[in-house]
A protein has these predicted regions:
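Non-heme di-metal
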Residues: 1-199
């Protein structure tokens, strides 16, 4: 509803939504949707905080979108707990097949994200679609290092998940991969002035 009002207010012309036929494999489609949302929400948390801190979003817009962002947190929280519940109710041999399917989903999503980062759409056309980095730079007006973006997203993810019942499982795969990426990126060198003092 919020997005539809913004689109209407600014007169943005959008292509009509195509028909979405039922998926041939509902479990695969559900897993792709759920894990994809875990990835997107993780970065959305950080970018939203960045927009808020930088003043790129006015207070009224932050207030409008805050419930939307928090709803994303509830979505991925629900998905993580559904996956755990589903695993527990599978027989051992069905669980093996399920884990193989989950690995296949992650392989598909990683490949898809590589294409997005390179700016290539589903039709093979080159696009400026590296949203996490270009979006972050657009918000701050400066180049945003991958490490700083990851640290911000990790902090915001922990903050948003902290308010829920501790008995609920949290999504862990994306934060785990983000911490590995942060370690591989190494610590940034602190800039110094001519006097040796940190800026």
């Amino acid at each position: 509803v919020v997005l539809s009002h913004l689109v209407a207010f600014y007169g943005i012309k959008l292509a009509p939504e195509p028909d979405y036929p039922p998926p041939k494999n509902s479990e695969w489609a559900w897993l792709v949707t759920g894990y994809s949302e875990c990835i997107d929400s993780f970065f959305a948390f950080g970018l939203f905080a960045l927009a808020k801190q930088s003043g790129f979003f006015p207070a009224e817009l932050v207030e409008t979108f805050e419930p939307v962002i928090q709803e994303e947190a509830r979505h991925i929280l629900f998905f993580a707990n559904w996956v755990a519940w589903h695993r527990r109710n599978l027989s051992w041999w069905r669980r093996i097949a399920f884990e193989a399917r989950v690995l296949g989903v992650w392989a598909f999503l990683i490949w898809e994200r590589i294409g997005i980062a390179r700016g290539i759409d589903a039709d093979g056309e080159v696009q400026d679609a590296n949203f996490a980095m270009t979006g972050g730079s657009a918000v701050t007006g400066d180049d945003l290092s991958p490490r700083l973006l990851i640290e911000l997203c990790l902090g915001e993810n922990e903050r948003r998940m902290a308010g829920y019942d501790r008995r609920l499982l949290r999504p862990t795969t994306v934060p785990f991969l983000a911490r590995i990426a942060r370690r591989l990126l190494g610590r940034p060198k602190a800039p110094t002035t001519g006097t040796g003092e940190m800026r």
